Amino acid sequence: MSCRVCLEDRSIKPLPCCKKPVCDECLKRYLSSQVQLGQAEIQCPITECNKHLDESTILYSLPHDDIIKYKYFLELSRMDSSTKPCPQCKHFTTFKRKTHIPNPTKSENKLKIQCPSCQFIWCFRCHAPWHEGVNCREYKKGDKLLRHWANEIEHGQRNAQKCPRCKVHIQRTEGCDHMTCSQCNTNFCYRCGERYRQLRFFGDHTSNLSIFGCKYRYLPERPHVRRLVRGSVCAGKLLIAPLLIVLGLVLGALAVVIGLFGLPIYCLCKKQRKRTRTGMPW
């Protein structure tokens, strides 16, 4: 049986969702890449199948190192609004009285959580480090403390990045810059914080000269030059695209004309040549 991914003939057990054959090696690589992107609900690798792989299939096929990550993302996707992970150590905390800091002095202090695992103190409502004397709304408007903490570089990377859609801060422990928010499923870049966008012919976030490209991929220290170059490339493509479309239409029309008139002439000449060789009269 041939694997639908690598096309090699192997002894393969079909996938339970669509009964299509995918070898163990290809399935492991695919699942591992999805876990690295923070996916808990993983779709079947077969493009024409829109179903999700069941948990047992994923756990059976995942490499051992990725099983812990997958279980974390799975728990994160299933939790309700009363349970959130600690911003520092990812330990899940359920909003109960026993997790509060004792003797709250204000109503806002009811949201003050101390992680039982790492003792980090944070706000349950906005999922940020605790902001003493400032409510969540005021803190979000001028969250200097949070931005300072998130922008601090530790172990060669910033502490956290804010999701461009739901504004939840996400901390990366390892993996590539392509992040998927577990709250709203937005794909964004951990380095620059921008959404992943792509448009055929104009490139994507990994393209150096694309208007959608990450600012750290091309001239990060010269933003004005970067915008000028990328804008010029985009403008050039916008000018070239109509010309290519017109050229394609002209060539297509020319091919049709040649086919309509050239093919009968070619057949007639071929028939004439054959008659000449056999000495047959017209």
From Swiss-Prot:
InterPro entries from the UniProt entry: BRcat_RBR_RNF217, E3_UB_ligase_RBR, IBR_dom, Rcat_RBR_RNF217, RNF217_RBR_vRING-HC, TRIAD_supradom, Znf_RING/FYVE/PHD
Reactions mediated catalytically: [E2 ubiquitin-conjugating enzyme]-S-ubiquitinyl-L-cysteine + [acceptor protein]-L-lysine = [E2 ubiquitin-conjugating enzyme]-L-cysteine + [acceptor protein]-N(6)-ubiquitinyl-L-lysine
Topological type in the membrane: Single-pass membrane protein
Region (TRIAD supradomain): 1-218
Binding site for Zn(2+) 4: C189, C192, H205, C214
Transmembrane stretches, start-end: 243-263
Any single GO CC term annotated in Swiss-Prot or TrEMBL for this entry: cytoplasm
CDD domains for this protein: BRcat_RBR_RNF217, Rcat_RBR_RNF217, vRING-HC-C4C4_RBR_RNF217
Residues where Zn(2+) 3 binds: C163, C166, C181, C184
Gene Ontology molecular functions: ubiquitin conjugating enzyme binding; ubiquitin protein ligase activity; zinc ion binding
Zinc fingers (RING-type) by residue: 3-49, 163-192
EC numbers for this chain: 2.3.2.31
The family this protein is said to belong to: Belongs to the RBR family. RNF217 subfamily.
UniProt-recorded name of the protein: E3 ubiquitin-protein ligase RNF217
Gene name of this polypeptide: rnf217
